[in-house]
């Protein structure tokens, strides 16, 4: 086994977790977590599920854990992180996860939550990619009082590729944040981000995404887009897309849009005899479901679409 190379090709400013106060707390207090390593050339043919269960007797507390995932050369893994919360009390989960994806390896990382919770969830993910490796992220979340995913992806060697797709359906006073920083540290790398939110009641969605391109990272191809459907006046969506580019031969774009349901589409569905409530759900489902189109595993895609439909229908 080769030693960890999590700081390879990364500037100290980009990789310094100690600037994050919750990471400092985690480094001091983390008591649990897991280490997962996939052997060279080994490809799991079924998804691996990490089941995070919070029991009803969990009282006010803070849980700190630290995880490590390593995919060795030419390995593949689909990992599903599933949150199931039964506690009605305030608590906090503070997680750190270090991911290393080595040459020609592929990791599909899927986050699912639709549990009602008064808890606070924060997760910091730092990933390092080698040549020809691929890191795909799919995020489906609804129901949490506060949830923040802080994702840093380092494309350290050429032809590495990363994607982040997110579908958030927020109700009541739910607050969800996604923060990404994609560091293009080598040439010929690709990154693609599409973040979608549907916001109702007094919910709030936040997206802050940064694409950083080093001078050496020529032929970079980077795309970033966030969209939000705001269903009433009290809901809120804040977006801060950023580009910081030092190379001159790149293709980079970013943008953010927000608005309400398209009334022409709604009228069309109603004119076909579909009740207004169901028409709303169909439009929301189509809007959020687009984030799963690039998922190649049909059985996993169908599972996620079913979960998404459950969130939209309040199940």
What label would you give each PLM region?
Residues 2-14, 18:
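Single conserved hydrophobic/aromatic residue that forms the stacking wall/gate
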Residues 15-274, 288, 295-315:
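Conserved beta-strand/loop scaffold segments within soluble protein domains that form the structured core
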């Amino acid at each position: 086994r080769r030693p960890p190379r999590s700081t390879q090709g990364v500037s100290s400013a980009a990789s310094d977790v100690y600037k994050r106060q919750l990471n400092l707390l985690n480094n001091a207090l983390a008591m649990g977590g897991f280490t997962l390593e996939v052997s060279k050339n080994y490809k799991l043919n079924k998804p691996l599920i990490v089941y995070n269960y919070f029991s009803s007797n969990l009282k006010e507390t803070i849980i700190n854990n630290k995880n490590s995932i390593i995919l060795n050369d030419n390995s593949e893994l689909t990992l599903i992180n599933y949150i199931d919360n039964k506690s009605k009390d305030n608590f906090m989960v503070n997680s750190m996860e270090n991911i290393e994806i080595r040459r020609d390896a592929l990791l599909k990382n899927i986050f699912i939550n639709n549990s009602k919770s008064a808890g606070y969830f924060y997760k910091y993910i730092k990933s390092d990619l080698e040549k020809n490796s691929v890191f795909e992220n799919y995020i489906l979340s609804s129901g949490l009082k506060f949830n923040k995913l802080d994702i840093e992806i380092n494309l350290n060697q050429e032809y590495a590729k990363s994607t982040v797709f997110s579908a958030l359906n927020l109700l009541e006073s739910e607050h969800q944040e996604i923060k990404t920083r994609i560091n293009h540290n080598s040439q010929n790398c690709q990154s693609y981000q599409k973040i979608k939110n549907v916001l109702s009641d007094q919910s709030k969605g936040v997206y802050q995404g940064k694409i950083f391109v080093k001078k050496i990272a020529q032929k970079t191809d980077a795309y970033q887009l966030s969209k939000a459907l705001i269903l009433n006046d009290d809901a809120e969506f804040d977006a801060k897309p950023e580009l910081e580019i030092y190379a001159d031969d790149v293709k980079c774009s970013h943008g953010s849009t927000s608005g309400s349901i398209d009334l022409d589409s709604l009228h069309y569905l109603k004119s076909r005899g579909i009740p207004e409530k169901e028409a709303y759900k169909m439009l929301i489902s189509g809007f959020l479901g687009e984030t799963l189109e690039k998922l190649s595993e049909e059985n996993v895609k169908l599972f996620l679409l079913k979960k998404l439909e459950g969130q939209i229908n309040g199940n």
